[in-house]
A protein has these predicted regions:
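C-terminal His-loop and adjacent cap/lid subdomain of alpha/beta-hydrolase
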Residues: 1-199
Length: 199
């Protein structure tokens, strides 16, 4: 039997306190895969998602590891901003004027370029594992493996996601990372035009 790991829409970009609070509140520490070098229950609150995926991929070196996201994933950016607002100790306001809408564009204090650049940094860290590949599509959709998205989303070389996954399953040498470059903030059914200009 072959094993494959697909990480979909989980770049792991969080505000400075969100990760440690989540680990503590959810009691995740005792469940850390501490048999993997570089991962420990005490270190879960500080390890980056990129380092975590790299450690898992290195440990299971014969398992292909694929990470999928969009360059401006609206749901991930929204919750990143929620973490920033919580970290700032702002007074709570029960209004979208504080939290913004879930598409991640009109969030009052959002810094989406930070989310994108950190996602790319984590992706680069994970790419240190020989069995890791990434697929970063343009746009702001959250979760790419559901419904028609799986058969319609394309990467940097116009490779369709479903075909890319099939290359992984076939063990093809053509299975390479497909990351869009110079992706502008999108205009899609889930978003509105943005004035963001991220490199």
């Amino acid at each position: 039997n072959n094993t494959y790991l697909i990480v979909d829409a989980a770049a792991g970009v969080q505000s400075s306190n969100s990760q440690s609070q989540s680990i503590a509140n959810w009691g995740a520490g005792p469940n850390a895969p501490d048999w993997i070098t570089g991962i420990s229950s005490s270190g879960l609150s500080s390890i980056t998602a990129g380092a975590f995926i790299r450690a898992v991929a290195d440990h299971y070196s014969t398992t292909p590891v694929a990470q999928l996201t969009t360059a401006y994933d609206g749901a991930q950016r929204y919750f990143y901003n929620v973490g920033l607002l919580i970290d700032s100790n702002k007074s709570y306001v029960a209004s979208s004027s504080m939290w913004g809408s879930s598409n991640g564009y009109d969030v009052a204090d959002s810094n989406s370029c930070d989310w994108k650049s950190t996602m790319e940094s984590y992706r680069s860290t994970a790419a240190g594992a020989a069995n890791y590949r990434s697929f970063t599509a343009p746009g702001d959709l959250h979760v790419l493996t559901t419904g028609s998205r799986f058969f319609e989303t394309t990467g940097s070389d116009s490779v369709v996601l479903s075909d890319w996954i099939n290359l992984m399953l076939a063990g093809s040498g053509s299975w390479t990372s497909e990351n869009c470059t110079s992706c502008s903030p999108p205009v899609t059914a889930q978003s509105s035009p943005s004035t963001l200009s991220c490199p």
